[in-house]
C-alpha cells in the first residue's frame, strides 16, 4: 500500500533508491515542452525493479498508453477529458488541491486520492 509520494523531475537513481516500498514515484517535468517517452519507460522499468509504483504527472492518456500505475493531476489542471478514457481497474488517478474549490474540482475529476497542501502555493 502506498503511503508516501515522492516527486521527481529527472531520472536520478540515488534519490529513488532512498525510497521505501510504501513510496510511489511521481514524475513531473514541467521544464521540458516535449514528453520523453523513452525516459518515462526507463523510470517505469527502474521503479518496477525496485517494487515502487510509478505515476506520470499531468498526462493521463500517456500514462494509460505506457501502462503505468497511475497519473497525477496537479491542482491547476481542471480538465475532465480523462473521464472518457478507459483504463485498467488498478490504474489510480491522484490529484492535489489547495482550497475547497480545487477539492471540488478533483472530486469532479474522479481522483482516487487528493493531496491537501499549501506547500506548493
Where do the model's predicted regions map?
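Conserved N-terminal beta1-alpha1 strand-loop-helix module at the mouth
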Residues: 1-80, 85-112
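Contiguous, function-dense segments enriched for cysteine-driven chemistry
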Residues: 100, 116-121
Amino acid at each position: 500500500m502506498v503511503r508516501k509520494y515522492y516527486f521527481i523531475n529527472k531520472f536520478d537513481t540515488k534519490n529513488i533508491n532512498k525510497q521505501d516500498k510504501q513510496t510511489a514515484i511521481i514524475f513531473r517535468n514541467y521544464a521540458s515542452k516535449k514528453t520523453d517517452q523513452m525516459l518515462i519507460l526507463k523510470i517505469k522499468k527502474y521503479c518496477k525493479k525496485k517494487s515502487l509504483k510509478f505515476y506520470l504527472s499531468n498526462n493521463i492518456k500517456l500514462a494509460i498508453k505506457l501502462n503505468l500505475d497511475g497519473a497525477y493531476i496537479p491542482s491547476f489542471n481542471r480538465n475532465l477529458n480523462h473521464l472518457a478514457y478507459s483504463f485498467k481497474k488498478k490504474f489510480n488517478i491522484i490529484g492535489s488541491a489547495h482550497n475547497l474549490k480545487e477539492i471540488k474540482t478533483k472530486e469532479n475529476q474522479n481522483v482516487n486520492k487528493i493531496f491537501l497542501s499549501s506547500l506548493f502555493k
